[in-house]
From Swiss-Prot:
Cellular location(s): Cytoplasm
Lineage start: Bacteria, Bacillati, Bacillota, Clostridia, Eubacteriales
Catalyzed chemical reaction(s): 2-(N(omega)-L-arginino)succinate = fumarate + L-arginine
CDD domains given in the database record: Argininosuccinate_lyase
Entry similarity comment: Belongs to the lyase 1 family. Argininosuccinate lyase subfamily.
GO molecular-function terms, A-Z: argininosuccinate lyase activity
SUPFAM superfamilies tied to this protein: L-aspartase-like
Species assigned in the record: Clostridium tetani (strain Massachusetts / E88)
Protein name: Argininosuccinate lyase
Lyase in keyword set: yes
Superkingdom: Bacteria
Gene3D superfamilies xref list: Fumarase/aspartase (C-terminal domain), Fumarase/aspartase (Central domain), Fumarase/aspartase (N-terminal domain)
One Pfam family, short name: ASL_C2
């Protein structure tokens, strides 16, 4: 059954039917579509547009459709244009002509907008929950591994940090990610139901009722904007893209750290794979896939931005292309967060190796300069002196702490025996605001 056709003489080409149909992907909106329809029909009853018994029959029919779909008795398939026509057609088959009254004072334009907003809100709340679970895992991993390791700039060993402080940086990134999604939910939390095609309706409907019934903060202010707004899709996918960027950065570090060149961590067998030809290989494929899927979500963002960039008000069929990008992006980010959480929950930190790496990279050079500054040497002069000491150490294959006091005094008479305690790697984290790192 088509929801349109009275003004057409010719039949729709089968090629066009298939090309036009969105049922294959928008079928996942079935719950939201039924929920929106129930709120709409209750409003029609409250406004005396439909009789009470008609409202009851329609709601009963919608509930039976939902139950049959959930029980796998009703398959969402067939030659339907979309999920809306699938549900309405099945409703009419079950309850007869009264089912044809469901769409009174409603267009598919406001119908799909409210369905999509409800779905986007629900999946985004699930993503927030998964972020919180990942944050807890990161926090537990950090508390169990408060050991020193090299901190890097330009991927070169720079200064001493702790594994705890390093991994907690991602906790804070996820904190911002969560806030961004919450802000996006706040921005989109207005109901478009009742806007109809673009200009409202001549019926005295109650948009406040349906907005409240469906859990929206309020109804939209402008009918045209209500049906043609897809900012929420763009905002959410933008949020998801930033999450993926953070997960990709963490994945990159896990990949590096698990390599023999670093050997700081071991990713469990559960989240690794092997090689079909090289028996010794243990590959960090989970992390690599997260890193790779980041580009996929970026592509979804560019896709929806491109779809929306040249569309006049109000609804245009181009907007049918909004859903697959969102579905793909939300599915991808949710699965990546869950995989990252599993990977981190079983991660082993090789504490001895992180300590050895600290001792190999002159990571107490800045502290050595600070020592001279505290003795009265201007920082720029201290910086130059320590640079010369590092060059000397490289030539002698020694670390700064391995130089005896006489060697150090060749570079500056301000050095005394207390230098060794001052530049000890653990001690360095007990001074100044560095204490916050621990």
């Amino acid at each position: 059954m088509k929801l349109w056709g009275g003004r057409f003489k010719g039949e729709e080409n089968k090629l066009m039917e298939d090309f036009n149909s969105s049922l294959s992907f928008d079928k996942r909106l079935y719950k939201e579509d039924i929920l929106g329809s129930k709120a709409h029909v209750k409003m029609l009853g409250n406004c005396n547009i439909l009789k009470d018994y008609e409202v009851e029959e329609i709601i009963k029919g919608l509930d039976s459709i939902l139950k049959d779909i959930e029980d796998d008795k009703l398959k969402i398939q067939g030659e339907y244009e979309d999920i809306h026509s699938f549900i309405e057609s099945n409703l009419i088959q079950r309850i007869g002509d009264v089912g044809k009254k469901l769409h009174t004072a409603r267009s598919r334009n406001d119908q799909v907008a409210v369905d999509f907003k409800l779905y986007a809100k629900n999946i985004s709340l699930k993503i927030i929950e998964s972020i919180e679970t990942l944050q807890n895992t990161i926090k537990n991993l950090a508390e169990k591994n408060n050991v020193i390791m090299p901190g890097y700039t330009h991927l070169q060993r720079a200064q001493v940090v702790t594994f705890k402080h390093h991994i907690m940086a991602y906790y804070n990134m996820l904190k911002r990610d969560k806030k961004r999604i919450e802000n996006s939910i706040e921005n989109m939390d207005e109901s478009p139901l009742g806007c109809c095609a673009l200009a409202g309706t001549t019926y005295e409907t109650d948009r406040k009722f349906t907005a409240k019934k469906l859990g929206f903060r309020k109804e939209v202010d402008n009918f045209l904007d209500g049906v043609s707004d897809r900012d929420f899709v763009i905002e959410f996918i933008s949020d998801f893209s930033i999450i993926m960027m953070h997960l990709s950065r963490l994945s990159e570090e896990l990949i590096l750290w698990s390599s023999k060149e670093f050997d700081f961590i071991e990713i469990s067998d559960e989240f690794s794979t092997g090689s079909s030809i090289m028996p010794q290989k243990k590959n960090p494929d989970a992390a690599e896939l997260i890193r790779g899927k980041t580009g996929r979500v970026y592509g979804d963002l560019i896709a929806i931005l491109t779809v929306m960039k040249g569309i006049p008000l109000a609804y245009n069929k181009d907007m049918q292309e909004d859903k697959e990008s969102f579905f793909d992006a939300s599915d991808t980010v949710l699965s990546c967060i869950k995989v990252m959480e599993g990977m981190l929950s079983s991660l082993k930190v090789k504490k001895g190796n992180t300590l050895r790496a600290v001792k190999m990279g002159f990571l107490n050079a800045t502290e050595s300069a600070d020592y001279l500054v505290l003795k009265g040497v201007p920082f720029r002069d201290a910086h130059k002196i320590i640079g010369e000491i590092v060059l000397y150490c490289e030539e002698k294959d020694k670390s700064i702490e391995e130089l005896n006091i006489n060697e150090l005094k060749k570079f500056s008479t301000f050095f005394n025996e207390d230098i060794y305690e001052f530049i000890d790697y653990e001690n360095a984290l007990n001074r100044g605001i560095k204490k916050e790192i621990k």
